[in-house]
């Protein structure tokens, strides 16, 4: 038991500091921006310090545990703790949120509310990744919905109300299933509700009941991840959201769905997961092909990148359903890798739109010459997205491939088929991402346009892009840095499938 409440401070600090924004003096937006960025940096440093000095990597058990009784009536605790599974997403959250706050620099309308919402989301995300109580996990999960809805509805594009409503309907619908699953698991087989993760891991259920719980949780996480056919909110949301919101959506929000699948569906309901994993494998494979093909037909730049995100999530689903150490490690690496690459692509798409005010690819063209820095950065991240060797996406997808091939659960012919179909998906990825670069940057369309609005990336944009590019290259060259965080925890999770 750790006596200093590190995790409580890390979870509560952003939303508490964010609420002080409303009391800052009215001296323009600059004060609010700098205040928010300082809070984000301070939070990231605090998190890094707590993890470096108080977290043992070789211990697969829950660490930094905090447990305070909250509501006595139904045994609800403020229970936090982290392990190898949650440390990567928490650090990714801190990094991407700090950069998204910097990306939101041009926003001037209702600046106080905007920055408060960003910090409230920060708390909700870290709370979701560090909860060790099912009801607390649900509350933190819900803390995400309203901020994203407001960010969409207030600072989005022309169709912002449509996409915000679609987002809230999908995610709130998923949350109903999540709540039903939480209540079902908590109330099963005892007079007192049990919400503690540690107790629930050792709980066993009748097969039919476990399958019902599994489906409830699965629908909630499938909406957030997203898994086809529950993905249609994502392209609309990305198409209308401000690019700083897109960074948070692509970098962190989708990863919460993947985290929930591993943390709850795999860890708490292993029998049902082993029954469903062949179907998940098929869904993941279809998703890679379907989303890559659909992406190719999109005129809207942001929607094309959104469909590429859906395609990349297919690798995470396949890694989770492979039931091997290698596959699950690959899925966790893909979670981190796509968090960086997706956020960077949306940021660059948004800054390009700020300059040329065009969103359809067939209207663009020829901007590589007036904007060479933008061209270089966008091309680099497109290469990272199509899994170029030496970048993080390549390592993650390769490890997922190995996970399928070495898996004991599946016979040879399905493994060969799935690997073959995944390979087709990986061939489609360069087609849509390179054609996107070609339509934007090559040709002569905009070359004759007036040069006033065509200024290249400024120091803020360069700093942001390089800050994301360094981890992408770093993980690509030395993936052990990320893999070592979770490798012991992955073994513990998978031991449930073979020794239970």
From Swiss-Prot:
Keywords, ordered alphabetically: Chloroplast, Membrane, NAD, NADP, Plastid, Plastoquinone, Quinone, Thylakoid, Translocase, Transmembrane, Transmembrane helix
Entry EC number(s): 7.1.1.-
Listed transmembrane segments: 4-24, 37-57, 87-107, 113-130, 134-154, 167-187, 208-228, 242-262, 272-292, 305-325, 330-350, 386-406, 411-431, 462-482
Protein's GO biological process: ATP synthesis coupled electron transport; electron transport coupled proton transport
Molecular functions (GO terms): NADH dehydrogenase (ubiquinone) activity; ubiquinone binding
Coiled-coil segments on the chain, per record: none
Swiss-Prot/TrEMBL catalytic activity: a plastoquinone + NADH + (n+1) H(+)(in) = a plastoquinol + NAD(+) + n H(+)(out); a plastoquinone + NADPH + (n+1) H(+)(in) = a plastoquinol + NADP(+) + n H(+)(out)
First-tier enzyme category under EC: translocase
Membrane topology label: Multi-pass membrane protein
Signal peptide positions (record): none
Lineage: superkingdom: Eukaryota
Localization of this protein: Plastid, Chloroplast thylakoid membrane
GO cellular component, one term: chloroplast thylakoid membrane
The keyword Glycosyltransferase belongs to this UniProt entry's keyword annotation: no
Main location as per UniProt: plastid
Record-stated family: Belongs to the complex I subunit 4 family.
NCBIfam families referenced in this protein's UniProt entry, alphabetically: NDH_I_M
Name of the protein in question: NAD(P)H-quinone oxidoreductase chain 4, chloroplastic
Organism: Atropa belladonna
């Amino acid at each position: 038991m750790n006596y200093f409440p590190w995790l409580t401070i890390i979870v509560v600090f952003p939303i508490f500091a964010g609420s002080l924004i409303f009391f800052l003096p009215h001296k323009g937006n600059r004060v609010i921006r700098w205040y928010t960025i300082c809070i984000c940096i301070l939070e990231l440093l605090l998190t890094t310090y707590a993890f470096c000095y108080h977290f043992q990597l070789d211990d697969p058990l829950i660490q930094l545990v905090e447990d305070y009784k909250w509501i006595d009536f139904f045994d609800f605790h403020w229970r936090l703790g982290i392990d190898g599974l949650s440390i990567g997403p928490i650090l990714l959250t801190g990094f991407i949120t700090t950069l998204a706050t910097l990306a939101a620099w041009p926003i001037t309308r209702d600046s106080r509310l905007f920055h408060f919402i960003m910090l409230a989301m920060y708390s909700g995300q870290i709370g979701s990744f560090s909860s060790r109580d099912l009801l607390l996990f649900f509350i933190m999960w819900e803390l995400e919905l309203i901020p994203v809805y407001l960010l969409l509805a207030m600072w989005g594009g022309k169709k912002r109300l449509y996409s915000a409503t679609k987002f809230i309907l999908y995610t709130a619908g998923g949350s109903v299933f999540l709540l039903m699953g939480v209540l079902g698991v908590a109330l099963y087989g005892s007079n007192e509700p049990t919400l503690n993760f540690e107790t629930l891991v050792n709980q066993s259920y009748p097969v039919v009941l476990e399958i019902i719980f599994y489906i409830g949780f699965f629908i909630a996480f499938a909406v957030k991840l997203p898994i086809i056919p529950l993905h249609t909110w994502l392209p609309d949301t990305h198409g209308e959201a401000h690019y700083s919101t897109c960074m948070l959506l692509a970098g962190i929000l989708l990863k919460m769905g993947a985290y929930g699948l591993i943390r709850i569906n795999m860890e708490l309901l292993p029998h049902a997961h082993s029954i469903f994993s062949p179907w998940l494998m098929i869904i993941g494979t279809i998703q890679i092909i379907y989303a890559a093909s659909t992406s190719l037909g999109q005129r809207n730049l942001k929607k094309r990148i959104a469909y590429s995100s859906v395609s990349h999530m297919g690798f995470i689903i396949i890694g989770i359903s492979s039931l091997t150490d290698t596959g699950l490690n690959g899925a966790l690496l893909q979670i981190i890798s796509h968090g960086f690459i997706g956020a960077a692509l949306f940021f660059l798409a948004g800054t390009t739109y700020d300059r040329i005010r065009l969103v359809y690819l067939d209207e663009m063209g020829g901007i590589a010459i007036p904007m060479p820095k933008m061209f270089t950065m966008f091309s680099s991240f497109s290469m990272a997205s199509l899994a170029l060797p030496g970048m993080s996406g390549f390592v993650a997808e390769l490890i997922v491939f190995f996970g399928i091939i070495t898996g004991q659960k599946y016979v040879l012919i399905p493994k060969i088929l799935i690997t073959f179909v995944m390979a087709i998906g990986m061939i489609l990825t360069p087609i849509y991402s390179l054609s996107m670069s070609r339509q934007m940057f090559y040709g002569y369309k905009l070359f004759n346009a007036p040069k006033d609005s065509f200024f290249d990336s400024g120091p803020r944009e360069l700093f942001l892009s390089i800050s994301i590019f360094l981890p992408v290259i770093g993980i690509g060259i030395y993936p052990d840095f990320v893999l070592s965080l979770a490798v012991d925890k992955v073994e513990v999770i998978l031991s449930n499938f073979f020794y239970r």
